[in-house]
Amino acid sequence: MVRNSRLDICSIVNAKSGICDQDCKFCAQSSLYNTGVKRYPLLDEESILEKAKEAEKMGAVRFGIVTSGKRPTRDELLKIASIIEFLKVTTSLRICASLGTLEKDELSYLKDHGLDRYHHNLETSPGFFQNICTTHTFYDRVKTVENAKSIGLEVCSGGIFGVGESFEDRLELARILKDLEVDSVPINFLIPIKGTPFENFPELDVVERIKTIAAFRIVLGENVTIKIAAGREKLGDFQALAFFAGANGMIVGGYLTVKGRSYDDDRKLVEGLKELMGW
């Protein structure tokens, strides 16, 4: 449990869906797998604003623009920068982006247009990474995190668990994230998606999920936000335990291709947590 903390709530928009040539084996958006996911190009600013306003109503303080693919085109980057600028004057949200591998000048350009935080998961340990993706490397991801940190952006970077990794892989990832001095760590648990190579993977049980959250809190210390994200719904009635184990943030409103909990369910959870935890 993290004392004297604040519940960090964020929401995301799937701003560009599918059309990805990478082979991340857990992901519905890879064009290499037949998952039936919707495919569409970058949304316009009004569509993204609509999602941002929904996030505000749900109590989110951060809003992330997420696009599929290894990296955006130059035209997409320019449009996203304009959208970020638009959101900064039309909402009270802090704006995050998850656009894949970017260079320092590209990240600086987004920061100049109002970007507060960059999200780029490392996913798992360097030794296990090739088991979940072969079209880019673990160190490609590390470089992007380092690029974002070096130009003064906040960084959100975490992993996905239940993909066949060992507990030591999880601990190694936590130690690397600590060394990188990231600001926020999302904890995602595999949701097996039909059509992906991991569609038949067994899901982690509640105890294993709680142990993972607790281990990350022990390694990361108290100054880093730990957010429960994809798969948190599978904790069911034990979801509050995640916060006693060390989480102090969560994603609301659903994920990229998977629905999350209902607004009413999350509202009740947040109200209860604030009372229990003193947030």
From Swiss-Prot:
Record's catalysed reaction(s): (4R,5S)-dethiobiotin + (sulfur carrier)-SH + 2 reduced [2Fe-2S]-[ferredoxin] + 2 S-adenosyl-L-methionine = (sulfur carrier)-H + biotin + 2 5'-deoxyadenosine + 2 L-methionine + 2 oxidized [2Fe-2S]-[ferredoxin]
Enzyme class, UniProt record, top EC level: transferase
Pfam families in the record: BATS, Radical_SAM
CDD domains (UniProt xref): Radical_SAM
Highest taxon listed in the record's lineage: Bacteria
Positions of [4Fe-4S] cluster binding: 20, 24, 27
Residues given in the record as [2Fe-2S] cluster binding sites: 96, 156, 227
Pathway recorded for this protein: Cofactor biosynthesis; biotin biosynthesis; biotin from 7,8-diaminononanoate: step 2/2
Record note on cofactor: Binds 1 [4Fe-4S] cluster. The cluster is coordinated with 3 cysteines and an exchangeable S-adenosyl-L-methionine. Binds 1 [2Fe-2S] cluster. The cluster is coordinated with 3 cysteines and 1 arginine.
EC number(s) recorded for this UniProt protein: 2.8.1.6
Keyword S-adenosyl-L-methionine listed: yes
Molecular-function GO term, any one: 4 iron, 4 sulfur cluster binding
Swiss-Prot/TrEMBL cofactor(s): [4Fe-4S] cluster; [2Fe-2S] cluster
GO biological process, alphabetically ordered: biotin biosynthetic process
Domain Radical SAM core: 2-232
UniProt feature coiled coil, ranges: none
Keywords: 2Fe-2S, 4Fe-4S, Biotin biosynthesis, Iron, Iron-sulfur, Metal-binding, S-adenosyl-L-methionine, Transferase
Keyword Iron-sulfur among record annotations: yes
Job description of the protein: Catalyzes the conversion of dethiobiotin (DTB) to biotin by the insertion of a sulfur atom into dethiobiotin via a radical-based mechanism.
Family: Belongs to the radical SAM superfamily. Biotin synthase family.
Subunit structure: Homodimer.
NCBIfam families per UniProt: bioB (TIGR00433)
Protein name: Biotin synthase
Organism ancestry: Bacteria, Thermotogati, Thermotogota, Thermotogae, Thermotogales
